[in-house]
């Protein structure tokens, strides 16, 4: 079972990826029930996955995987978290789409409770590579060393300001 926190553009991209996986059910948690219902309908139109929607106040710990697609915890409001951490334990996986900071307070709290956590930096890099393919009109992303990009970004003062990368 998977829970998507949020129902915007990032949530739709995550939902698309989940529809191509072996996920059996998705729960969408969003402040706006209308947006959650729209995403739910999109998933149901494109898959056979069971989908439920609710608001953050009614979130439960039923899911194995929680994916944060909200801006909660993003710089400069880094202390915000998208869910009640009393629901998290060492059986959960927390995935954050936020890349600034690299490790959000939500992920730190999840780590402290023994959950497996995954930050949003790799998704950020993948978006950039996909954009480069579009900009250059050909697939150049497979020629780029992702490890170097990741290292540059990690060493870039934790994104307080993005490092200046100059192209020759």
Please place each PLM-identified region on the residue numbering.
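Glycine-rich adenosine-cofactor-binding loop
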Residues: 1-19
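NAD(P)-binding Rossmann-fold cofactor-contacting core
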Residues: 21-46
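A short, charged, Gly/Pro-tolerant segment at domain boundaries
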Residues: 142-168
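Conserved S-adenosyl-L-methionine
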Residues: 20-25, 112-116
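Rossmann-fold NAD(P)-binding glycine/threonine-rich loop
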Residues: 84, 90-142, 148
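Hydrophobic Val/Ile/Leu positions in short beta-strands of Rossmann-like dinucleotide-binding domains
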Residues: 4-5, 28, 96
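Rossmann-like NAD(P)-binding element
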Residues: 32, 58-81, 95
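Short acidic low-complexity segments
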Residues: 49-63, 86
């Amino acid at each position: 079972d998977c829970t998507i926190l949020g129902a915007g553009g990032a949530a739709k991209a995550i939902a698309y990826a989940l529809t191509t996986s072996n996920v059996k059910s998705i729960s969408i948690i969003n402040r706006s029930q209308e947006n959650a219902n729209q995403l739910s309908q999109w998933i149901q139109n494109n898959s056979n996955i069971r989908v439920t929607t609710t608001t953050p106040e009614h979130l439960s710990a039923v899911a194995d995987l929680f994916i944060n697609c909200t801006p909660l915890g993003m710089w400069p409001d880094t202390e915000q978290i998208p869910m009640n951490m009393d629901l998290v334990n060492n059986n959960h996986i927390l995935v954050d789409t936020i890349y600034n900071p690299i490790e959000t307070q939500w992920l730190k709290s999840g780590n402290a409770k023994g959950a497996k956590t995954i930050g949003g930096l790799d998704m950020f890099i993948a978006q950039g590579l996909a954009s480069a393919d579009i900009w250059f009109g050909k697939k150049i992303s497979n020629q780029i060393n992702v490890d170097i990009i990741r290292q540059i970004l990690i060493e870039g003062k934790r994104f307080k300001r993005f490092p200046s990368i100059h192209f020759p």
